[in-house]
UniProtKB/Swiss-Prot annotation:
SUPFAM superfamilies: P-loop containing nucleoside triphosphate hydrolases. Keywords: ATP-binding, GTP-binding, Nucleotide-binding. ATP binds at residues 8-15. It comes from the Bacteria. Displays ATPase and GTPase activities. Gene3D superfamilies: P-loop containing nucleotide triphosphate hydrolases. Belongs to the RapZ-like family. One of its GO terms (molecular function) is ATP binding. This is Nucleotide-binding protein VSAL_I0495. Disulfide bonds: none annotated.
Amino acid sequence: MKLMVVSGNSGAGKSVALRVLEDLGYYCVDNLPVDLLAQFVESIQHSSQNVAVSVDIRNLPKDPSLLKNTLTELKKSHDVTVIFLDAEDKELIKRYSETRRLHPLSLIGEQCSLEQAVELEKSILCHFKEDADLVLDTTSKSIHDLSETLRSRILGRESKELVMVFESFGFKHGLPTDADYVFDVRFLPNPHWEPTLRPMTGLDKPVADYLEKHAEVIQLKEQIQHFLMTWLPALEKNNRSYLTVAIGCTGGQHRSVYITQQLGEYFKQQGQQVQIRHKTLERH
């Protein structure tokens, strides 16, 4: 029996995650109190069906160490994976404003604004997030995108095959929270300053041709490939189910997109399971 524990910030997509897990054959329990988690797992430990449990801000113990200790003990004798869903504050506020729903911290008596409730919840859950096996930033994801990402990550974990995720981003939009490695490519020649290339992206051939004329672009790409190829066997031996590599430039439109696409295609050719995402392009 596999146990998935799903948590995260309210509005980040926990209900979507549970629906995906249910579709994958998991028996799902929503908002189980933490002090009943160990007892519940013990009661179904001989079941052949995989189980998913969501942990909500409303049923967390006042002592955060209780949840950590409970999960530590469960992992000693069970196959446990903790998934944490996150999103930027402004996106969570937007989602609540659009649905006109009350934040859970407002429902349990906290006298605070929506913005304060989001900030307070993040501070309460920060330690749980640090201990999660899989952290997903859902800021720019539609329900469909989140469902597909969760499905591929969960199936990848179950098959014990390492999934390599390459994502481009713009530093002006902030660092991705789910990255294992971040490479800054802002020092490379910038197509933005070429008027004909400015409206294009790193996926367009004229931009690729421009970048490939510069030796430092090719050198950096090959050095990142070599670094990842060198340490990939060790990462796979460490029982990781995914590896997220983020490439950032200023706006996330040209240089980072090109390098990310090139890396993803290279590792696909090496037979790796690869996902490629362009965070800034997905915003538009």
